[in-house]
Amino acid sequence: MSRFSAVGVLLICLVSACSDGANDQRTYVLTTGTTGGTFYPVGVALSTLVSARAEEGFSLTAISSAGSMENIKLLRDNQAQFGLILGTFAAWAYDGVGPISTPQPHIRSISAMWPNVEHFVLRSDLVIDGTVSDLAKLKGERYSIGMRNSGAEHTGLYIFDALGVDYTEDLSIAYLGYGPSTNALQDGNIVGMNVPAGPPVTAIARAYALLGEGMTILEFSEEEMAAINQQFPLWDFYELLPGTYPRQDKPVTTAYSSNVFVVRDDVSEEVVYNMTKLLWDNLATLQEIHSATKSMVIEAALKGIPVPLHKGALRYYKENGVEIPEHLLGG
């Protein structure tokens, strides 16, 4: 049994043990991601924390999904009331831009979660300056952007547009998942791949182990960071320290955006306040469940959030002395 499977069984047992006598509570749905990703085990852990505290007056059921795009739809249709989504998708959904053409004004933020780190990989013999703008100089090469309709595809193409990478004319785009991208890079079927995720990423670790100096993670310059933040200030610099991956002996300055915990605006202030309090009061428990959450600190709870806070979350942060950016007010 895998580690996550074992954790899942344990959490389900805990939920069952704590569910007696709670049938009169309002049950909310938290939509997460695929069972093999990070959103799902963290979502299950959150639902377990709620269920273990019947005095909160509500319960939370975590469900798996295809990820951020489906989560937006489930929130829109009120089939889910809470969700974990990429920060880019939160911005697109709220304003109705990019791949989400209709504004979703009902979405509110609870907290930034762990970082979603950009890994734009390129075969080393094609590297010129060592930054992501090198991708604009490729002509006719095959590059993997991620699976179709995935967060990797949409955020990758958004960054390409911001940096002037003509992926329709200059590149031959491949739509491969992370593992298949590593295989294709090793086999010479692609020259690079886009892998946004919380490090260390298994696919990147495998690529380093297989190719070593034959592959490079491209860096972001100040100018490139300004370009991708021009419409939505979502990204910041992230340093991959030496040793993050095997055979990586130098630091890499890349970019990250936050994954965001969101909620519908019609969920009561009291419920969202209690959910926010529960999240931060039990952070150590979440960090035992999944290592991605170990980077979470309340001082960065609002960093990279593009959508106004729910009133319940706003009340919690005010009570705890967290400085609140103006664009997050008015939720």
Where are these regions (language model features)?
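Bacterial signal peptide processing site
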Residues: 19-21
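An extracytoplasmic/periplasmic, membrane-proximal ligand-sensing/linker region
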Residues: 197-219, 229, 270-331
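Bacterial N-terminal signal peptides that target proteins for export
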Residues: 1-7
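Ligand-binding clefts/hinges and TM-proximal coupling segments of bilobed small-molecule sensing domains
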Residues: 134, 139-158, 233-305
